[in-house]
A protein has these predicted regions:
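Conserved, structured core segments of small domains
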Residues: 1-83
Length: 83
């Protein structure tokens, strides 16, 4: 199952000077394959596309950012929408 994750933090909690955006997720979370990361840095928002079978695995992936971010997890279709 694919998930689109929108992770947002405030400017005051920005990780830029504290290890960067890589400190906001666990790349070794069991059961999660990270497919893409995109940033809207002026908005303090990071977007992830991950593949996982269980939501608990996605939550473990996001655990490092729980104290400084909010996250919206949305299941998405594996089939692209093309006109």
């Amino acid at each position: 199952m694919l998930f689109h994750i929108t992770q947002t933090h405030s400017p005051e909690l920005c990780p830029k000077d504290d290890g960067g955006s890589k400190t906001l997720y666990n790349p070794k979370a069991e059961g999660v394959k990270l497919l893409a990361i995109y940033g809207a840095f002026p908005e303090h928002v990071i977007y992830y596309i991950v593949e996982a079978e269980k939501i608990e695995a996605v939550e473990a992936f996001l655990m490092p950012g729980f104290k400084r971010c909010t996250s919206k997890i949305t299941p998405v279709s594996k089939s692209p929408i093309v006109n």
